[in-house]
Amino acid sequence: MGFIFSKSMNESMKNQKEFMLMNARLQLERQLIMQSEMRERQMAMQIAWSREFLKYFGTFFGLAAISLTAGAIKKKKPAFLVPIVPLSFILTYQYDLGYGTLLERMKGEAEDILETEKSKLQLPRGMITFESIEKARKEQSRFFIDK
C-alpha cells in the first residue's frame, strides 16, 4: 500500500515540478516581452520628440538665418552669419535623429562594442550577486538600528 502511495506521490511531485518550471519560463518570457515593448515605446517617444523639436527648431533656424543674412547684408558685416554655423549643426543632428540613420548607426556601434570591447562593459567589483546585496542590506539595517 505504501509503495503505491509513494509512487503516485512521486509522479505528482514530478508533474508539479514540470508545471512550476513551465510557469517560471512563461513568466520570464512575458517579462522579456514587456521589457522589449517598453524599450520600443521609449525609443518611439524619443524619435517623436526629436521630430517635434525639429519642427520648432527648423522654424527658428529659418527665421534666424533670414534675419542674420539680412542684417549682414544691410550692415555689410559678414560676422552676423557666424551664429548660423552652430545652429546648423544642431539642426542637422536633430534631422538625422528624427528622419535619418543616426539610430541605426548608434545601434551598429553598440553591437560592435558588445562584440569587440567586452572588457569596457564590466562592472566595478564584478557582477552583482544575491550575497553582495544581502551584505549591503544587513550593513545598512545595522546602520539604521545603531542610530
From Swiss-Prot:
It is found in: Cell membrane. The chain crosses the membrane at residues 53-73, 79-99. It is a multi-pass membrane protein. It comes from the Eukaryota. Keywords: Cell membrane, Chemotaxis, Inflammatory response, Membrane, Plasminogen activation, Transmembrane, Transmembrane helix. Signal peptide: none annotated. GO terms for biological process: chemotaxis; inflammatory response; positive regulation of plasminogen activation. Expressed in peripheral blood cells and monocytes. Expressed in adrenal medulla. Receptor for plasminogen. Regulates urokinase plasminogen activator-dependent and stimulates tissue-type plasminogen activator-dependent cell surface plasminogen activation. Proposed to be part of a local catecholaminergic cell plasminogen activation system that regulates neuroendocrine prohormone processing. Involved in regulation of inflammatory response; regulates monocyte chemotactic migration and matrix metalloproteinase activation, such as of MMP2 and MMP9. Interacts with PLAT and PLAUR. This is Plasminogen receptor (KT). The gene is PLGRKT.
